Structure formats: C-alpha cells, structure tokens
Amino acid sequence: MLNMLISFACSALSSALMMRFVTPNMWITMAVSAVVFALVFILLTRIIMKKVGTLMEIAQKDMMANRSDKAIKELQDGLKYGPWQIYVKQQINSQIGTIYYLKRDFKEAVPFLEKGFVRNWVSTSMLAISYMKKNKTSKMVETFGKAVSGNRKEPMVYAVYAFCMDRIGERNKAIEVLKKGIAKTSDERLQENMNLLEAGKKMKMKGFGDMWYQFHLEKQGAIIKKQTKAMTGRRKQVLR
C-alpha cells in the first residue's frame, strides 16, 4: 500500500531528523517516529477513503438514474486508488461486478466478482449463483462458504445459499444451511423456510423484499402470477 510506504518514509525521516538535530535518546526518537507514522497513515487513509466514498455515491446515483454504463466507467476510474489502500480495489471490483450482474450481463460480471471483496456478501453470493448456473457445484459451495464466514449475522446469505442448494437437488444440505443460519441469527424467515423444506415444499423468499430479486433466481412477475392464481382459487371456493 502506498499510504503505508509513505508513512514509513515519513517516520524514518523524522527519526533521522530527531537523532541529528534534537536528541540522541533512542526511546524518545522511537516514540516520535511512531506518532508520525500513525498521523500520516491516518491522514492518507481518510483522504483516499473519502475519495472512494464520493465515487461510490456518484455511481449509486447513476444507477438509480438508470445510467449503469456511466456508473461502471466511474468505478473503473476509481481502480487507480487500489494501490493506496488495502481492499479498495476488491470493493470496487465487487461493485462493478454487481452492476453487470444486475444488468444480466453475467459473462462480464463474473471476472469482476471473482476479484471482489469476500466480505461483500451480495457480490460473493452473485458469484456463487453464477457458478451454480454453470453447473460448477463445488465452486458454488466454496464461494457461498466464504460469503457466510464473512457475514455470519446476515440472514439472507443463508437463505440464498439454501435456496440454491435446494435448486440443485440438495434439500437436506439446504436444511442444514438454514439450521446454521437460525443458530447464528434467530431469524424467523429462516425458520419458516426450514419448516417448508422439511414439509417437502419450496422456499418462500418474498419475506426478504425487493432485495431478493436482484439475484435473478426468481422473477417478480412469476411471483405475482402465482399470488394472483392463488387469490382466484380462493374466490372460486367462496363463490361455491
């Protein structure tokens, strides 16, 4: 990281100046050197993270205005901050990959998602789903494992993982995933879905709201169609 190298350089310079012009006392020199390193490092980190934060906000506004291509370009320009701060490049790659995934441009999304930040459970889950769609089950399981390990208190990551396991015919393993999620989060939606799987039924993800649909595992229109059909059936029963 450039900010760390610059901080070390400033620290070393302050040590040399202290020994040359102020005091030969090694302990005082080391204390001043440590303070200089910390101050420079914190200052540079704040400057870089502020620039990255501003970049993310601009990209988010562009996404909300349906200017996804512009958002991607702005984020790609932000990759120049990668050498300055740890995980910045990975976070930006996660955002770019997520945008491509939301556009259903999965071919473009995967390379960025693979270079993304593992603690971003949304982008990591999108990568796992991409592997599932390519029938790369072992890579899907491995990637979901990373998403869960970095976000143990996030209920939805367990739900998405379990949904995918059930989709590939591993219902028992899906139930195990939900059990782990319930133990970590005590989320009622996970409990409800585990009960459904144990009863031989499909999971219901509408409890997670619109966020669920970004994974493109279920079409919102299909859900509405099912709900309409169910309501129509109930009306017929009432009429009889």
Predicted regions and their residues:
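Alpha-helical adaptor scaffolds
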Residues: 82-156
